[in-house]
Amino acid sequence: MRLLTRPAPAAPEVRRPAGVPHWLPSAPCTPGHCLAGTHAEVGLPRRVARCATGIAVVAVGLALAPLVRCCRPALRGRLTRAWARAVPAAFGVRVRIRVSGAAGRLPTGGVLVVANHISWLDIPLVAAVRPARMLAKSEVASWPVLGALVSRGGTLFIERDRLRSLPATVARIASVLRAGGPVVVFPEGSTWCGRRHGRFRPAVFQAALDAGVAVQPVLIRYRLQGADPATAAAFVGEDTLLASLLRVTAARGLVAEVTVLPPIPSGAHPDRRSLARAAQRAVTGPPSGPQDRHGPGPQDRGVSGVN
């Protein structure tokens, strides 16, 4: 086991990149500041094995996606959840999925699933809880591997730099929800390192109000062998997908904790801002009495297209 040690630099000055519209969400998290620290690493052979296994699992999922879509909904859901749990496990991440005592059964039918956003791993982690269509920025479609994966999953894309396209996107989400389909959104609109959270943007919550469906909050946390929140899985700032992948496969004892929190009835809130605040409080606050559901198993880098 090798111990990686880097001094943590001073907090970065938050600057919005030139030419980026002021309404686009951004986070102060950067690789140089948030990813510095000390964590144990596995040896090179295990890293190579993890990379190869992870890429193989993703490739199998891409190849079988057309066949899985032809299956009955119940079987399709089981296969998708099993594959989604296998992806992080293949990259060396232990997965723990929990359901808060008050949450009861996992959601079915039309529901707006909202989660905090830290890493590209968030995508399969949420799918392991509830397979659903996802809202993502249009740039994700061109990402290597991940782009093809989310595109085949029926992702709803949005051009974030075109503010006028937002109402149409909200209407599309509401249409999917009315038809009984779940939709996943990362309402922070950008990835954060996991030690802090961003504000939940209210726009997409209008879709839940229009469709009359509940909001399902999900909390995602990454830890190293039960320690405080770890940033090894974070995909922030000017980080590249390759650098993030290599960091994940090198980490020893990385655990992803996914907690399903009690659903929030949209009708209990007068407007989207109130609903967004309620969802944010649920996610950023400590979960109440979670129970195990499954065993182990400033440049925006998020996938979300939320404004």
Q: Where does each model-flagged region fall?
A:
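Generic beta-sheet signal
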Residues: 109-115, 155, 181-187
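Membrane-embedded segments
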Residues: 118-172
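A cross-family acyltransferase "interaction/gating" segment
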Residues: 145-147, 162, 195-270, 278
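A transmembrane-helix-recognition feature enriched in membrane-embedded lipid enzymes
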Residues: 33-96, 148-153
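Soluble, non-transmembrane catalytic domains of enzymes that act on hydrophobic metabolites at membranes
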Residues: 1-37, 96-101, 123, 202-203, ...
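Catalytic-site beta-strand/loop segments enriched in glycine and acidic/polar residues
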Residues: 176-205
